């Protein structure tokens, strides 16, 4: 199990191909085929994500939301992400389209995992604006989410995008949507751990 988690960590934490990870393990005296390592990442990333949500520390109630494109099967897919004003990861969701329904699905996930924010800074996307408006309209409380469109405030989430995208820069893109979902979830989790966003941080995840 330690070897599996170590291999998964190497792939998700550093800009390495699966063959690079295979070579690193070989140097350590462990012979594992790169396709096996890929299956490990596919299998264990969702499990680690589920556990991570239980341990993630609370984020601030002021969020910065944005989306970036990811190539999957040669087509643009959209990774919705949000960080709080301190740069802590709020949540993430890969979607097939960039539209109101996708933005709403992301926000429902983010709010479900983190609670409702006081304010969300967004770009000029009409889809994001409409998604927040719908959530406010159907809210069961008087607490409404305020929106703000200050371009420089979203620099923090755009910089965070680059951290995530560097991890996949060595690849030619994902072939399948589910593989992209699972791998990106793993990369996001490692980024959350790197930011020290987990409670009981002394407990090792990859040992």
List PLM regions with ranges.
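Residue-level recognition of single "structural anchor" positions
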Residues: 1-207
